Design a protein with these regions (language model features):
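Basic nucleic-acid-binding interfaces
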Residues: 1-151
Length: 151
């Protein structure tokens, strides 16, 4: 083939370290906007960034030129450093080392975006741990419970 063509949507989820301060509600829009910019700088196309005070959800179109692990590393490393400079409250801010990345079909991208937009509502009914376990079960991802949501 003369061209390398891809269209891979990713739903990425990552959580703060348990020893890290939560992201203050008023700062969430700025954090989401910055992460959106980082995704685009990595050559990907950010469609939605959202989440709550302790975790992030984003859906984006993965660049054909960048491996997912590199994109995630850049997003987490640069956003962590940036968040620490917002306010002294965040001096010990850090993301956990792990993450969940799940493929999203073209037909469910809008549904995934809507899900991310309603994070506040979802977490009135269930914890992050419950939500994340649902994703792992849905995608049939095997994981070690000993290291689940651990720094």
């Amino acid at each position: 083939m003369a061209q390398s063509l891809t269209k891979i949507y990713i739903h990425l989820i990552f959580h703060i370290k348990t020893t890290s301060p939560n992201i203050i509600e008023k700062d969430l829009p700025r954090v989401h906007t910055y992460i959106n910019e980082l995704i685009n700088v990595c050559g990907c196309t950010a469609l939605k960034v959202g989440g709550t005070e302790n975790h992030i959800h984003t859906v984006f179109l993965l660049s054909k030129d960048e491996p997912l692990s590199h994109v995630v590393e850049e997003i987490k490393r640069k956003s962590s450093r940036w968040i620490k400079n917002i306010d002294p409250w965040y001096k010990d801010f850090a993301w956990q080392s792990g993450y969940g990345a799940f493929s999203v079909s073209q037909s469910t991208v809008d549904k995934t975006i809507a899900y991310i937009e309603k994070q506040r509502e979802h977490h009135k009914k269930r914890t992050f741990k419950e939500e994340y376990e649902e994703f792992l079960k849905l995608y049939e991802v095997e994981y070690n419970k000993e290291y689940f949501i651990r720094d």
